Amino acid sequence: MPSLVGSEMCIRDSFSTDVTVARSVLAEQLGAAMVMVMPPYHGATIRVPEAQIYEYFARLSDAINIPIMIQDAPVSGTPLSVPFLARMAQEIKNVAYFKIETAGAASKLRELIRVGGDAIEGPWDGEEAITLMPDLDAGATGAMTGGAYPDGIRKIVDAYAAGKRDEAAAHYEKWLPLINYENRQGGILTAKALMKAGGVIASEAGRHPFPAMHPAVREGLLDTAKRLDPMVLRWGK
């Protein structure tokens, strides 16, 4: 499996099966090595039953030749049980990767691996790595974290993969304050704020109408980051 960096992974989803398929086909044509897709949902209340979710992913799989990662995240408001996820992995050709971001992620990852067996090629952690160590202990083989400090996250994952759990835990404890700031305070603006501070980008503004980061949060974020000296703060200078 190619490394999933930058444009090699494409996030595609829509409430429309046809739109999701079209976007994913285009993503593959443009060089994506994988697509990550949530179950279909619209607004706060419109959801579909498991049968339609299954068909949604089955049709997508039939249209492309690259793996599908199902993102299991609370924002979709769609409960995805372990037996259902495992069944899709076992029966739908390209469904093989899972980004688990629900409460109790480690327990769900562990059970998904047990129930799904070899069909679960990529059980992944998410949510900015706030639960990375428990998720790795549960069997996660990868993580989709915030994009601002991969040098810090890599130290954790590399040490764990090398069988050096104590070293991985030490790195995790060191970087956890910054991970926490992103997950609980700065949110999706964290990477932009750090990149702006490091001279990588000119503006840290999110898409309107997303509110700007509060100055006090930004100050705390940068203070926390400077203690760790991530590459992002030096990259553009």
Give residue spans per PLM region.
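Hydrophobic residues within beta-strands of alpha/beta enzymes
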Residues: 35-36, 68, 98, 143
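Catalytic alpha/beta core domains of metabolic enzymes, predominantly
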Residues: 59, 73-185
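C-terminal alpha-helical cap/extension of soluble enzyme domains
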Residues: 136-140, 148-237
